[in-house]
């Protein structure tokens, strides 16, 4: 009995100390935004739903308002919720909020190099170069459009080969989207059955899946310890090395056949720039080339294929929407030519459907973490340099001020009274400010051309009753996952 009493007393004393330490931490934060009291080391981890962090964030903002602080383990994060707070930070204070925050899974691979996950002068130089180079290769222009059309033609042949049998469209769409960015980065496309290509897609998929999982969240919070422990993170570390080795080999292949007067792709352009900038502190070196190329490949492979896959599911759930898209395709494009990107200006309903698929899917509601680049005053709070920030882009996609029925799939959200496409300020699927997605114009073109080309050639059929379709993405940690399904592509 005495031993039990002493143990209970020790536990109570320990908890009391933890509470006192937490209160002390709150006081020394000064004018940081308010938030729930964190426990030492684990922060607010126990107060969050690990399977659905976005819902937990939404509940916290109802109590603390649109700007508040949470602790993810030892990491202190300021959360921005809603259009007004996000826009004020990322646009009105663009420079101050332009740093890249911590993402341990991707930092394991990129280590602060490359255009997407770097900071400071490195990020600025690489971003300027990448945007200019991608523009030179026709990003958003005719050159890339022809590559997308070619890839769309290959996809149509693959789908015709299924003869209307039920299939999981995931790998078909992943191969197609990845080949577009491959042609820009490497100057060539992969054969769809290429083992190296399939292995690459599998590894990237595993990294993305791990980053979104509850275990990935734990790794984000406690990576300094977990990287030495057994667990699924060890496979991610191995895959990261393999992905880097793959890209190094691609760069070496380009080096051996480089013509400085005739760049074939992004890698060539970077290599040529490296030759021009040979001073010691230049950011144009091999490590940044390898990691920037991997950045582009990651970003260009997953987003488009996931959006299309979810879009097909939604159209099967809403056959009236699919019918209207078919009607607009028949009226504007017909069946005797391939869709062109300029067609989107004459197809407001189809474009509204694509926008609504992006809004309703809301795959990454927490956005990509930012970091404060210098001491900043924001809405009466003081955010010291280095503070991590989560701009909750998902909160914009469900804001009833902009979308009348945010929980429903409804393309009318993007159409005015005359049936024309309308611009909605809160619709920011590619973020905004100085770190918006540099591939947004490519993604928009891919989504339109793949979507219309497929629907020009096929009708969609679900193998079971429409009531069996689960159209709601499943919360998975920091993200939302599309339900697995099969479908038939029925030739028209």
Curated annotation (Swiss-Prot):
Its cofactor is heme. Its main location: endoplasmic reticulum. CDD domains: CYP2A. Changing residue 209 to Q: Same as wild-type. It is a peripheral membrane protein. Its EC number is 1.14.14.1. It catalyses: an organic molecule + reduced [NADPH--hemoprotein reductase] + O2 = an alcohol + oxidized [NADPH--hemoprotein reductase] + H2O + H(+). One of its GO terms (molecular function) is oxidoreductase activity, acting on paired donors, with incorporation or reduction of molecular oxygen, reduced flavin or flavoprotein as one donor, and incorporation of one atom of oxygen. Liver. One of its GO terms (cellular component) is endoplasmic reticulum membrane. PANTHER family: CYTOCHROME P450 508A4-RELATED, CYTOCHROME P450-RELATED. Belongs to the cytochrome P450 family. This is Cytochrome P450 2A12.
